[in-house]
């Protein structure tokens, strides 16, 4: 009888512990757009009062991100095809095997594109940009600390990884004869020691670049180069930005918010 009570007590404590873990489970709930990069769409600089400056994540029954509130709506007047981000629009995310499908601005009449990602062992293998009946497919090849992005075997970008973080992107420029004539180089620096909660979440719109890194960069600079006599020479273009971040008691950057059950 005494042994039976001990066994029952063990299972009771174990069950309570598991229940407590379940209750205290935390998920990424919001991301401030200051840490995102929408580099494949023309975003209007016009202030939108209907946007909270954060995207908000919802999850399905398997704890996978299924909906993101905060997506694109068109700017109608003098927009030149540009969009703004609004809390009135959301993205829908579905899964099939290794593929992740993202329906951008799912509840809007005018939508810029949809996306499909193939992710293998937390590595991006390909992404497809779907615009109407047209598809643009990017494939990714891995070699040492470099990741090469190609379209139909044409080099588009090279990503350099150091210590688990993306430190450099080189985007190659071509002339009409498909010869490289220059490049745009982006350097990421001043990484913190805080966990990047967007790591491997390539499918979140705007998070593709950040998803390569385990930590958060706090500075980046972009320079343009032209190819002259076999060497890359600065074309004079330059842009830099510093991201101010603070951290909570769990050392999580203030660009993220987590919600615990």
Listing of model-derived features with the role each one plays in the protein:
Residues 1-5:
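Positively charged n-region of N-terminal signal peptides that target proteins for export
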Residues 14-15:
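C-terminal motif of bacterial Sec signal peptides marking the signal peptidase cleavage site
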Residues 18-261:
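Buried hydrophobic residues that stabilize the cores of well-folded domains
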Residues 6-10:
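Sec-dependent N-terminal signal peptides
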């Amino acid at each position: 009888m005494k042994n039976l009570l001990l066994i029952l007590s063990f299972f009771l404590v174990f069950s309570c512990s598991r229940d407590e873990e379940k209750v205290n489970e935390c998920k990424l709930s919001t991301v401030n757009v200051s840490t995102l990069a929408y580099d494949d769409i023309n975003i209007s600089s016009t202030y939108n009062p209907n946007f909270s400056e954060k995207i908000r994540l919802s999850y399905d029954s398997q704890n996978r991100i299924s909906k993101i509130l905060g997506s694109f709506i068109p700017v109608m007047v003098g927009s030149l095809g540009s969009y703004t981000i609004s809390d009135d629009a959301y993205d829908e995310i579905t899964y099939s095997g290794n593929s992740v499908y993202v329906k951008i601005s799912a509840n809007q009449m005018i939508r810029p594109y949809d996306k499909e990602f193939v992710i293998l062992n937390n590595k991006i293998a390909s992404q497809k940009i779907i615009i109407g009946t047209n598809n643009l497919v990017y494939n990714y090849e891995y070699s040492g600390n470099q990741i090469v992005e190609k379209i139909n075997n044409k080099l588009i970008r090279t990503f350099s990884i150091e210590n688990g973080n993306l430190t450099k992107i080189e985007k190659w420029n071509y002339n009409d004869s498909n010869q490289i004539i220059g490049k745009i180089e982006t350097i990421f620096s001043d990484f913190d020691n805080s966990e990047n909660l967007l790591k491997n979440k390539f499918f979140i719109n705007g998070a593709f670049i950040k998803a390569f890194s385990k930590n958060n960069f706090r500075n980046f600079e972009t320079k343009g180069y032209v190819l002259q006599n076999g060497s890359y020479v600065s074309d004079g273009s330059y842009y830099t930005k510093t991201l101010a971040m603070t951290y909570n008691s769990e050392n999580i950057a203030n660009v993220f918010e987590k919600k615990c059950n």
